[in-house]
Amino acid sequence: MGLSPNMYRDVGDFSPISTDVIIIGGGATGAGIARDCALRGINCILLERRDIATGATGRNHGLLHSGARYAVNDQESAEECIKENKILRNIARHCVDETEGLFITLPEDSLDYQKTFIESCTKSGIEAVAIDPKLAKIMEPSVNPDLVGAVVVPDGSIDPFRLTASNVMDAT
């Protein structure tokens, strides 16, 4: 990969500028802060030593949590996840793939827990729908064939580079 001769320059090559906020790091957080500053009319500069989303953002799993996995034991985290899930689906739907999440119950598990799981999700504002195990096998052919229960939740997949790039573009 060739480097642009203009990409790396001495600090002395730049004219002094004034800004309200300096953001260090062009990942999801830095780009999101830059977008938020721009929407609020706050002047900012985003500094990144490489390309956007090349650090931790570019290496994440891309799962857009519904919060369901926290609903039973950590309602506060579950509520925060579904709130942010809905915000991202609203402002960056072009970056979200509607994959859904599937929680299964195996013969050694309690179907009573599945009921508790659904109730906890509902209490946290997360849609959780019990489905027939036969449908779960169609939805996910690699699922354990011995399952006795299944619940669908609004998990998704997000493209971290596309989200970061969109936020940077929105900030300019």
Describe each model-derived feature in a short phrase:
Residues G25-G27, R49:
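Glycine-rich Rossmann-fold phosphate-binding loop(s) that bind the pyrophosphate
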Residues V151-T172:
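Helical element adjacent to the flavin cofactor pocket in flavoenzyme catalytic cores
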Residues A38-G58:
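Glycine-rich FAD pyrophosphate-binding loop
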Residues H61-M139:
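Dinucleotide-binding Rossmann-like beta1-alpha1 core, especially the glycine-rich loop
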Residues G30-A31:
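N-terminal Rossmann-fold NAD(P) dinucleotide-binding loop
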